[in-house]
């Protein structure tokens, strides 16, 4: 028996209608999907790169500083070393790394000043008192930024043997160096600096006076208490130019802490008011802690 195939009528060309894809689908097909594929490939590449990446050791970075190219490598290696050293201190505590670092620092007077700056910070982060003589010597550099990095490193180590050298920089022609010197003395807390800090209370630079007052409070000296009282006055802080709200807040917090440390009676009522009504919660917390000293 013959099977009949049902006939299907085919429309004429004029009756055919083109089915158009949405524009968004075309964009996805030609642009978005390829971008997704590329992003996945890049992600896989970065993942494998991260898995196979091995960070250099402090000694390797130091070797790069010692032997690297002046144009591109030495200061970058010194920078990386300053960033990783804090997490590596335990591993190198009983090695000669500190002595090697000091030698490289002492031999870095010529060339890119950034090398010396970052090596100074590295010695500070390391916190080893053996680096103090080299850092004191570095205070004589003509580069003011390196002077400040050396001061900061000495403050981090906080060895009182550095006090006389730091005091000398309270009279620097550069106000930034004077400010850093006063700040560092607040960290070292050496009563031997009291007389020079009292003189610094009359400095022409506001910040030098502030940090001198803070440093004096750290050694129990109330000579700068009136300077600190101004820093817990919102009207005074609001008039300061060139400071962010966060910086002004930190100034007030430091002043509150120092006045509490001194148990300075004229400040008690004002600190009490700050603890109850100040809009800055950090100032309130600092005030509550300071009141515990009275």
Question: Model features per residue range: what roles?
Answer:
Residues 1-20:
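N-terminal intrinsically disordered, acidic low-complexity segments at the extreme N-terminus
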Residues 20-31:
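Short, low-complexity patches enriched in S/T/P/G
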Residues 29-50:
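Hydrophobic membrane-insertion alpha-helices, especially the h-region
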Residues 44-53, 72-90, 113-128, 137, ...:
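Structural detector for internal amphipathic alpha-helices that build alpha-solenoid repeat scaffolds
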Residues 51-65, 87-108, 128-140, 159-171, ...:
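Amphipathic alpha-helical scaffolding segments comprising HEAT/armadillo-like alpha-solenoid repeats
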Residues 69-70, 109-112, 142-143, 173-174, ...:
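Short inter-helical turns and helix N-cap capping residues of alpha-solenoid HEAT/ARM repeat scaffolds
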Residues 104-107, 147, 282-283:
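Short, mixed-charge aromatic SLiMs
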Residues 273-289:
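C-terminal/domain-terminus segments
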């Amino acid at each position: 028996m013959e099977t009949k195939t049902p006939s299907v009528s085919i429309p004429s060309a004029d009756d055919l209608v083109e089915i158009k894809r949405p524009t968004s689908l075309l964009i996805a097909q030609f642009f978005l999907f390829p971008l997704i594929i590329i992003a996945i490939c890049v992600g896989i590449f970065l993942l494998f790169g991260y898995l196979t990446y091995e960070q250099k050791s402090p000694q390797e970075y130091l070797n790069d500083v010692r032997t690297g190219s002046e144009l591109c490598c030495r200061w970058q290696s010194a920078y990386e070393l300053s960033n990783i050293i804090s997490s590596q201190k335990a591993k190198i505590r009983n090695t000669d790394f500190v002595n090697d670092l000091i030698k490289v620092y002492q031999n870095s007077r010529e060339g890119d000043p950034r090398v010396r700056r970052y090596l100074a910070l590295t010695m500070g982060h390391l916190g080893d008192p053996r680096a103090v003589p080299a850092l004191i010597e570095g205070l004589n550099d003509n580069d003011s930024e390196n002077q400040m990095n050396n001061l900061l490193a000495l403050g981090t180590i906080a060895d009182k043997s550095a006090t006389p050298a730091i005091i000398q920089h309270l009279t620097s022609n550069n106000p930034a160096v004077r400010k850093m010197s006063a700040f560092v003395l607040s960290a070292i807390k050496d009563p031997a600096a009291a007389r020079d800090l009292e003189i610094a209370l009359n400095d022409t630079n506001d910040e030098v006076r502030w940090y001198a007052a803070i440093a004096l409070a750290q050694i129990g000296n109330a000579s700068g208490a009136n300077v600190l009282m101004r820093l817990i006055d919102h009207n005074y802080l609001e008039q300061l130019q060139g400071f962010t709200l966060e910086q002004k807040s930190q100034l007030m917090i430091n002043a509150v802490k120092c006045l509490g440390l001194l148990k300075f009676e004229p400040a008690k009522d004002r600190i009490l008011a700050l603890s109850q009504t100040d809009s800055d919660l950090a100032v309130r917390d600092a005030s509550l802690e300071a009141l515990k000293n009275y």
